[in-house]
């Protein structure tokens, strides 16, 4: 087990003072060797008395959006900035087309760098070439080809999850929206990840533990993180949960094998799709399944909470969406065609993603030296982020600061924009799902789950802010815009016009 490799004798010692002394020594050596851009301005640099760059890191975590804006206001297209992973490059959206399919600018290595994927216990964020290829192929090919057959089962599973997790009493009931959504999505999508009854609670704990461990470790200097990770309480908790996850997934795999042997049917789940996509190459199927489950859960829950917080304050939009659901379902039932025709709902999702994207700077890591057309050289191992600030640009989106759920619904009616205005269509002006060949490969599955979930909620519940007060929908941390998962709302069971 991971946690058993840690020397327990060290845990009771006064580690922090000792580590700080070591930090001071290493800082003097390390700070002179860090990569610094030769021909680019460096923002948010550590001052001479900024011990271990702590102030610079704190400033980036607190004010990243304003720092990035000031960088582009002052330096136009490209600049460097000190962040919580060292010095990174930031490029304007004009670079998006050069980045979109560049073979040496990778997503998974970037994620691994951001979230310590090279360290034991953080395997959920690691990048390994064979696993990365299998993950992408299984989503783009096997999952995509199976999606049509999955709509009805997903609708049934999500409907059951809502029945199990949401209030059944009449009258208004206050709920912790984030917690309810996490468990609803975990249970409703469990068939493609894990059938064990412990899965929903496990995956919620896993997501929380990884987020807390990653944030806690990021507060330490890069050169100390491998050592510090062995002692931080948040990391120790992550190790414990990862051990439990391996046991749970192993138990589920045995159950699936037995089930398939008895029925003779090939199940629709990632374990089977990984086998097909591996083409005989070796991989860690337990870690790969947890990797994709974590990525899916995080994005789905974040987006659905943002949507529902918006809807809790907009009864007219709720009414319009309900009318659309009734009309579409009566005609198409549960099908891919039905989800396509939920055009106002699709527009609402895309507008929420425009206003509050989960990341407002899309990252890549150079796995080889990269030379761009204007002469910019990105050295191997260097991360670079493309800013998504065009999503808030008045020239691109009139009245951009205003949330308009009908914005993309109207754009889809304009000649030539039927496809680009769809939720799952990334463009250089809307980087919510990334861009190019490395845009989020699971976005079609995500859109299906989100639409099915919202259909059920709209038909079965009224929703409004708790205590009549509208709180913040999101909170920002570094370059992320996270849903306010602690928000409470009031929900009331209603008699649906149609039975889904």
From Swiss-Prot:
Keywords: Heme, Iron, Membrane, Metal-binding, Monooxygenase, Oxidoreductase, Transmembrane, Transmembrane helix. Its EC number is 1.-.-.-. One of its GO terms (cellular component) is membrane. Its main location: membrane. Heme binds at residue 440. Pathway: Secondary metabolite biosynthesis; terpenoid biosynthesis. Disulfide bonds: none annotated. PANTHER family: CYTOCHROME P450, CYTOCHROME P450 MONOOXYGENASE AUSI. Belongs to the cytochrome P450 family. This is Cytochrome P450 monooxygenase ausI. It comes from Penicillium brasilianum.
């Amino acid at each position: 087990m991971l946690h058993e490799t840690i020397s327990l004798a060290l845990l009771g010692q006064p580690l922090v003072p000792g580590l700080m002394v070591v930090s001071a020594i290493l800082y003097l050596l390390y700070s002179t060797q860090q990569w610094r851009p030769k021909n680019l301005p460096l923002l948010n640099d550590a001052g001479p008395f900024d011990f271990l760059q702590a102030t610079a890191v704190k400033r980036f975590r607190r004010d990243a959006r304003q720092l990035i804006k000031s960088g582009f206001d002052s330096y136009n297209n490209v600049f460097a900035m000190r962040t919580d992973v060292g010095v990174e490059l930031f490029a304007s959206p004009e670079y998006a087309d050069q980045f979109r399919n560049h073979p040496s600018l990778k997503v998974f290595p970037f994620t691994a760098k951001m979230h310590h994927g090279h360290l034991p216990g953080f395997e959920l964020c690691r990048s390994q070439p064979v696993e990365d290829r299998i993950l992408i192929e299984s989503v783009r090919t096997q999952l995509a080809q199976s999606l049509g057959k999955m709509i009805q089962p997903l609708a049934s599973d999500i409907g059951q999850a809502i029945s199990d997790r949401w209030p059944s009493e009449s009258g208004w009931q206050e709920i912790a929206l984030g917690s309810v959504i996490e468990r609803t999505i975990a249970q409703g999508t469990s068939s493609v990840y894990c059938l064990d009854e412990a899965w929903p609670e496990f995956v919620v704990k896993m997501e929380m533990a990884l987020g807390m461990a990653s944030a806690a470790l990021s507060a330490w200097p890069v050169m100390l993180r491998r050592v510090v990770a062995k002692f931080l309480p948040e990391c120790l908790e992550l190790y414990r949960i990862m051990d439990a996850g391996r046991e749970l997934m192993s138990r589920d795999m045995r159950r699936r094998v037995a089930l398939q042997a008895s029925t003779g049917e090939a199940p629709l789940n990632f374990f089977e799709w990984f086998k097909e996509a591996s083409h005989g190459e070796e991989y860690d199927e337990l870690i790969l399944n947890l990797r994709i489950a974590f990525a899916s859960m995080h994005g789905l829950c974040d987006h659905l909470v943002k949507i529902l917080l918006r809807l809790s304050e907009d009864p007219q939009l709720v009414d319009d969406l309900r009318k659309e659901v009734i009309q579409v379902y009566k005609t198409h039932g549960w099908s891919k065609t039905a989800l396509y025709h939920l055009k106002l709902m699709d527009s609402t999702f895309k507008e929420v993603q425009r206003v509050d994207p989960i990341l407002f700077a899309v990252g890549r890591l150079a796995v080889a030296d990269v030379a761009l057309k204007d002469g910019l050289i990105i050295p191997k191992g260097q991360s670079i982020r493309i800013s998504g600030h065009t999503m808030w640009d008045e020239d691109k989106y009139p009245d951009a600061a205003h949330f308009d759920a009908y914005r993309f619904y109207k754009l889809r009616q304009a000649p030539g924009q039927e496809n680009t205005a769809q939720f799952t269509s990334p463009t250089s002006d809307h980087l919510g799902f990334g861009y190019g060949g490395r845009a989020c490969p699971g976005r079609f599955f995500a859109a299906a789950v989100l639409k099915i979930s919202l259909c059920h909620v709209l038909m079965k519940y009224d929703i409004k802010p708790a205590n009549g007060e509208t709180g913040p929908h999101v909170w920002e941390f570094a370059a992320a815009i996270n849903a306010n998962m602690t928000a409470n709302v009031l929900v009331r069971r209603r008699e649906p016009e149609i039975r889904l």
